[in-house]
């Protein structure tokens, strides 16, 4: 979450008159995150999240995200629900941006996830994948392997000034992944951005999964790889095999990986690392003046990419090919 677009009180009040969520008492921007503008609303009927969708979210994709959240919730996945306005629509326009209001979920996101939380998010991700199997809408992933070349071209000039040799690393890895990317793995609905700040906990219990604007249809194990990167490294960028074992074990208890998925996981983890390295690099070079946003460090994902380049098999992530402790 973040704030790129400042919302004037008068325009917000006019927008909220279209909803039955009570009288606005206060609102404030949420600085965490990097993609969309988010505000916490307090009204006479409770707390809500207002999201203005920014650069990487097209208004024509909003029915997919918002309908998906309702679909998942109906199947037991704890995720936000969009509020319909008085006309029955789940989104409108505010400050020239597509905007939606969702209900507020209780919980806090873990600043430093522990082993139990890694296991819980693995289970939660697998349940999300299973719950999405009968979702009728489809959306291609614009930030999968087919979209990385354009991101590289947008950011290439800024690579070596950030770190000597980064341009060569990106170029070589992109060439390799475009050639080697798997095409026959199980696919379906994925979250595609399940970082710790998009998972709420009450203690070690997963209380909610939020922030669905990158949800799409893609390789299920690619979503696993994204989480492996997001949840299983320490602040010093070292890989925590205990957390990885817990995460993969939690996932496998709900949806065991196929042999093909297990074999492909190191490659998918490289791809996931490259994806976030590229988007972070693009974002770091294009922060709007005055935006309430904290750009994420691209080099964090350069380190993760180099780690995954050294991985031979899923055993290096703490499990054997049969999904048990290595």
From Swiss-Prot:
Q: Which domain of life is it from?
A: Bacteria
Record the organism: Rhodopseudomonas palustris (strain BisB18)
| Catalytically driven reaction(s) | L-homoserine + ATP = O-phospho-L-homoserine + ADP + H(+)
Which EC numbers does the record give?
2.7.1.39
Gene responsible for this protein: thrB
Keyword Ribonucleoprotein part of the UniProt annotation: no
- UniProt keywords, alphabetically: Amino-acid biosynthesis, ATP-binding, Kinase, Nucleotide-binding, Threonine biosynthesis, Transferase
What HAMAP family does this protein's entry cite? Homoser_kinase_2
NCBIfam families the UniProt entry points to: PRK05231.1, thrB_alt
Mind telling me which InterPro entries this protein's record contains? Aminoglycoside_PTrfase, Homoserine_kinase_II, Kinase-like_dom_sf, Pseudomonas-type_ThrB
Q: Name one GO molecular function term.
A: homoserine kinase activity
Q: Which GO terms describe its biological process?
A: threonine biosynthetic process
What pathway is this protein said to act in by its record? Answer: Amino-acid biosynthesis; L-threonine biosynthesis; L-threonine from L-aspartate: step 4/5
Which family does the record claim for this protein?
Answer: Belongs to the pseudomonas-type ThrB family.
Q: What is this protein called?
A: Homoserine kinase
